[in-house]
Curated annotation (Swiss-Prot):
SUPFAM superfamilies tied to this protein: Family A G protein-coupled receptor-like
Side Extracellular, residues: 1-26, 80-96, 160-189, 309-321
Main location: membrane
Membrane topology value: Multi-pass membrane protein
Keyword vocabulary terms for this entry: Cell membrane, Disulfide bond, G-protein coupled receptor, Glycoprotein, Membrane, Receptor, Transducer, Transmembrane, Transmembrane helix
Organism annotation: Danio rerio (Zebrafish)
Gene Ontology CC annotation, any one: plasma membrane
Membrane-spanning intervals of the chain: 27-47, 59-79, 97-117, 139-159, 190-210, 288-308, 322-342
Cytoplasmic topological domain residue ranges: 48-58, 118-138, 211-287, 343-371
UniProt protein name: Probable G protein-coupled receptor 85
Name of the coding gene: gpr85
Glycosylation sites: 3, 84, 183
Compartments where located: Cell membrane
Length: 371
């Protein structure tokens, strides 16, 4: 691999602009710092604050761990290759290991975002089932399943099934995309695109579900039933109680008055709690959809370039487009902390109180007198 890096395209190395190298190193260093520090702060917050020990934040913690792995291990090797003039100075085995970790992180994020979209739909459409079944152990089982599937997708190229190699134009070790007639990586790309499409379809179904529940339906009045001025039935109102208290009713208490005073307040409180939980679940779903949207937007240009290499025969991919697409895929590892803080009010509040130790209202001091 080292011989391949130095021998083949020595003229290309001389044409690399120092300004382009400086911009690559600066931007990649910033991505590494933000990806490691930002995701580490979010992870510490999720572990330290017990109010965040819930199903969606377990999945968010797993996403942060995957981004930390990619930022701390894979990106420094890219930084070194750019610094050495787009050359790989390590061995073939190291290249395969780094490529394996990068592809593992990519597929893990895609699989996890799909599982999160399914749980978000269950949280809103089937909330009772969601609260009973999605416990800590269920989330742990989902996380282990996602990592297992990701390893199954990323490990075959290590055995030269869809070969990993150093791609000079991308400054990284990854899939070597050849023409579709002699290609081994097309199946991996098709599966990744299918996962992203399925995730968008689940969120689309969730949007339709919420929209249908928000439609204003006409009120249908059902007449109340009365035999002795004690109205009861589906259309009964509070007038039955007034009639009965005024003495118009004879006989036993009507059915609509049994237990109303004892249960009305509890029912009202329970309904308000459900509405509050529904709003919280909607905010969390919005945050995860923004994360999914940014993942698709930042990885989309690179996927287009990969499909271009496989199917296009004529023109070569422009170098500027390929560099921008690769660096956008790198930037995906550092955007999640910003999305979490700016789109989730609960995380923002916990971040200020737990990590920054800022509180809006201080505890009152004990009274004292001056003698």
């Amino acid at each position: 691999m080292a011989n391949y890096s130095h021998a083949g395209d020595h003229n290309i190395l001389q044409n690399v602009s120092p300004l382009a190298t400086f911009l690559k190193l600066t931007s990649l260093g910033f991505i590494i710092g933000v990806g490691v520090v930002g995701n580490l702060l979010i992870s510490i917050l999720l572990v330290k604050d017990k109010s965040l020990h819930r199903a969606p934040y377990y999945f968010l913690l797993d996403l942060c761990a995957s981004d930390i792995l990619r930022s701390a291990i894979c990106f420094p090797f890219v930084f070194t290759s750019v610094k050495n003039g787009s050359a790989w100075t390590y061995g073939t085995l190291t290249c395969k290991v780094i490529a394996f970790l990068g592809v593992l992180s990519c597929f893990h994020t895609a699989f996890m975002l799909f599982c999160v979209s399914v749980t978000r739909y269950l949280a809103i459409a089937h909330h009772r089932f969601y609260t009973k079944r999605l416990t800590f152990w269920t989330c742990l089982a989902v996380i282990c399943m996602v990592w297992t599937l990701s390893v199954a997708m990323a490990f075959p190229p290590v055995l030269d099934v869809g070969t990993y190699s150093f791609i000079r134009e991308e400054d990284q070790c990854t899939f070597q995309h050849r023409s579709f007639r002699a290609n081994d990586s097309l199946g991996f790309m098709l599966l990744l695109a299918l996962i992203l499409l399925a995730t968008q379809l689940v969120y689309l179904k969730l949007i339709f579900f919420v929209h249908d529940r928000r439609k204003m339906k006409p009120v249908q009045f059902v007449p109340a039933v009365s035999q002795n001025w004690t109205f009861h039935g589906p259309g009964a109102s509070g007038q039955a109680a007034a009639n009965w208290l005024a003495g118009f009713g004879r006989g036993p208490t009507p059915p609509t008055l049994l237990g109303i005073r004892q249960n009305s307040n509890a029912a009202g409180r329970r309904r308000l709690l459900v509405l509050d939980e529904f709003k919280t679940e909607k905010r969390i779903s919005r945050m995860f959809y923004i994360i999914t949207f940014f993942f698709l937007s930042l990885w989309g240009p690179y996927l287009v370039a990969c499909y271009w290499r496989v199917f296009a025969r004529g023109p070569v991919i422009p170098g500027g487009y390929l560099t921008a697409a690769v660096w956008m895929s790198f930037a995906q590892a550092g955007v999640n902390p910003f999305i979490c803080i700016f789109s989730n009010r609960e995380l923002r509040r916990c971040f200020s109180t737990t990590l920054l130790y800022c509180r809006k209202s201080r505890l009152p001091r004990e009274p004292y007198c001056v003698i």
